[in-house]
Amino acid sequence: MHLTVFYLVALCTFASADDQPRYIINKLPYEQIKPFPAVEPDCRINEIALQFQPQLHISSGCHPYPAVDKNGYISTGLGVSHVFTDCDGSPEGSQVYGRAYVYKGYLAIMYAWYFPRDYMVSPVWIGHRNAWEHAVLWLGGLTEDPELLAVAAKSMWGYRTYAPPKSKYMKDDSFKLEYSWMVMSHHYLTATKDPGEFQDLIMWNNMTERARESLRLKSSSHFKSPLSDDRFFRALRKSYPF
């Protein structure tokens, strides 16, 4: 296993410390953030991340949007008061963010989606601008023949774990997730039999440093990317299924 870890490090760095210089975050309207181009399978981590990238089925609410551009500009989000403003897809294209790490002998890959708004319907509209959802895929057989052993999807309370993933939730190597809600809840991720869509995948270490820095900082109460070091490693600890 130690040789496997060194092999992955040599082919594609997958960890980065939050020790870079700080600077002011700039913002752009949510529909003007340009996504990063999708990663190429140019290292082993990226190959595996692309191979096992989940599908996302949207049953209600906003579609995923880019959260940050190459210059570090982040999305302003969409206020809940704009009830009739569409958020069914960015004209610039969609994005899913990935970050990988070998944790306790397993390869963990987080896939995270950004939504400009989240709300629920009760007697009145309740919600907030900016929302993140994520799932952690846990794999064994890191280099030669990776195998999906478990999926931990962020739910309303903690993580819902699918171990092993049932075939009805799979399409080839892709786990099918749904962005859903219950009547009085905010949105969350759950497994689904329904096919979804793929977004352009950008991995943490393929992003620019300005983009990573902007995602490290908390610019508002709800723009808290799960990809930053503290939240990422906390997610690995809490979602560990073995």
Curated annotation (Swiss-Prot):
- Compartments it resides in: Secreted
Which UniProt keyword terms apply here?
Glycoprotein, Secreted, Signal, Virulence
Q: Which residues are glycosylated?
A: N206
Q: Where is this motif: Conserved heptapeptide motif?
A: 127-133
Q: Which InterPro entries match?
A: NPP1
Keyword DNA repair among UniProt keywords: no
Sorted alphabetically, which PANTHER family does this protein's record hold? DOMAIN PROTEIN, PUTATIVE (AFU_ORTHOLOGUE AFUA_5G00600)-RELATED
Q: Can you name this protein?
A: NLP effector protein 8
Q: Which organism is it from?
A: Plasmopara viticola (Downy mildew of grapevine)
Record lineage: Eukaryota, Sar, Stramenopiles, Oomycota, Peronosporales
